Design a protein with these regions (language model features):
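Active-site flanking residues adjacent to catalytic metal/cofactor-binding acidic residues
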Residues: 7, 70, 193-194
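Conserved acidic, metal-coordinating active-site core of Asp-based
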Residues: 103-204, 213
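Short, surface-exposed amphipathic charged segments that create phosphate/polyanion-binding patches used
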Residues: 80-88, 170-171, 240-244
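Short amphipathic alpha-helical segments
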Residues: 18-19, 57-60, 81-82, 139, ...
Length: 247
């Protein structure tokens, strides 16, 4: 039985910098609401690498009542308005991230005027730009900086972002925190994601899905659906419901 259906945001709920397909959003939201009265429809929540304010806003669209994952491994609890992480001491543990943020401000942003640092992020250093070619140009600089100064850090990229994380502070860690908070196992979770940062979590959940716009690495570890973004999320949600109904 799948007890949680989890979705990524960018590339799944919508294409970055584009208006969502509101008809699909409403259908996904309706299934989530219906889950509160049904044993076969799992509730919906989010696992994203984007910062808390964006994740919270989309969670409100979808009427998410469960904790959700932001910045890959931060778990926000509505109850008590609190954030849970796997870090022992955020200030000390994140010193390499703080250093990367300063380097991004001094070395990357002046060279790439359309790029911005994700200033609201707590636990990782994120760069966003609406043009894929800008992100592609930034990636080698970040790779070299990490290799030279912080070889243990993880880097995950999308068409519109570069994210630098503490080692292991990725979406699999976020999924583990989420599962523990709901007293379920990873074998009771379905997840849909589209880029490399989703791969660690997709490999470990029971039902991994991806939209047709996913990267090759993601398609290789998931059931790839013949639909993009929110259409694929809705399709995956229905597949999970049918799976539960068949048990």
């Amino acid at each position: 039985m799948i007890k949680l259906f989890v979705t990524d945001l960018d590339g799944c709920i919508s294409h970055p910098f584009k208006t969502p397909e509101w008809n699909n959003i409403e259908k996904i939201r309706s299934l989530n609401i219906e889950s509160r009265k049904s044993d076969i429809i799992p509730p919906l929540t989010i696992c994203t690498g984007r910062p808390y304010p964006y994740a919270e806003a989309v969670a409100q669209w979808l009427d998410v009542r469960l904790p959700f994952v932001f910045e890959s491994a931060g778990l926000y609890h509505w109850n008590g308005n609190r954030v849970e992480t796997a870090l022992n001491n955020i200030q000390d543990d994140l010193e390499p991230i703080f250093s990367m943020k300063e380097w991004i401000r001094s070395h990357i942003l002046p060279e790439f005027p359309t790029a911005n640092i994700e200033f609201s992020k707590m636990m990782d250093a994120g760069i966003v730009a609406p043009e894929k070619e800008v992100i592609d140009a930034i990636i080698p600089f970040v790779q070299e900086k990490i290799k030279t100064d912080f070889p243990l850090l993880e880097m995950h990229t999308t068409d519109i972002s570069v994210n630098i994380l503490m080692p292991g502070n990725n979406k699999l860690q976020g999924m583990k925190l989420l599962a523990e908070s709901q007293n379920v196992s990873l074998s009771e979770i379905a997840y849909i994601g589209d880029t490399g940062g989703d791969v660690p979590a997709l490999k470990e959940v029971k039902m991994p899905f991806s939209p047709s716009n996913a990267t090759r690495a993601v398609k290789d570890v998931s059931e790839n659906l013949d639909a993009e973004t929110s259409s694929a999320v809705l399709m995956a949600y229905k597949k999970v419901i049918e799976f539960n109904r068949s048990l």
